[in-house]
């Protein structure tokens, strides 16, 4: 049953144990060379940094805002985008690290922070000619382990972002499979470690109980001798 946000209460309905929801994302930048330095400011490129869903879905169903922290040389370096497309377009001449912070509608979910090195130049300098676009984007996954009831509802009720074809600059299908395999392997390893710890705990408790019984017997023997 669909609930309104206010109905969940200050704890967002509490944590839903045993639930894991994965939301794949793509983040990065594209850049275009002007062909020469711009006379008024010496800028050489126009670039766009972005965060977008890997699948065709509207992230605003669960994302409140995305914050992009640019280099201090830009006016108002802390940029905030509250609806799709989550992107910032600027011009410049140098590469620098951009800090991306994703905030969620549910205040009880901690923000996710990403770090992206803005790329303007091709590794092959000749590729820069002809105003060819430079692409630097990455696949990642936001994993919600034991989300709140509110967040679970938000994550499972998102709609399509566009009705047309939806694709990325980079082919991530193979990388997605590998990431899934790593995630499954990590889950199995964690389950094994938990089971192992439970066995150790059980053995420790049995040892403690044996020692307690021995101590009790010794105390009883001492009392008998005293009599």
From Swiss-Prot:
Domain of life where this protein originates: Eukaryota
Gene3D superfamilies registered for this protein in UniProt: YEATS domain
Pfam families recorded: YEATS (PF03366)
Region spans: Interaction with TACC1: 168-227
InterPro entries linked to this entry: YEAST_sf, YEATS, YEATS_dom
Cross-link annotation Glycyl lysine isopeptide (Lys-Gly) (interchain with G-Cter in SUMO2), location: 37
GO cellular component: NuA4 histone acetyltransferase complex; nuclear membrane; nucleoplasm; nucleosome
GO biological process assignments: positive regulation of DNA-templated transcription; positive regulation of double-strand break repair via homologous recombination; regulation of apoptotic process; regulation of cell cycle; regulation of DNA-templated transcription; regulation of double-strand break repair
Cell compartment(s), UniProt: Nucleus
Subunit details: Component of numerous complexes with chromatin remodeling and histone acetyltransferase activity. Component of the NuA4 histone acetyltransferase complex which contains the catalytic subunit KAT5/TIP60 and the subunits EP400, TRRAP/PAF400, BRD8/SMAP, EPC1, DMAP1/DNMAP1, RUVBL1/TIP49, RUVBL2, ING3, actin, ACTL6A/BAF53A, MORF4L1/MRG15, MORF4L2/MRGX, MRGBP, YEATS4/GAS41, VPS72/YL1 and MEAF6. The NuA4 complex interacts with MYC and the adenovirus E1A protein.
This protein's name: YEATS domain-containing protein 4
Source species of the chain: Mus musculus (Mouse)
Gene name of this polypeptide: Yeats4
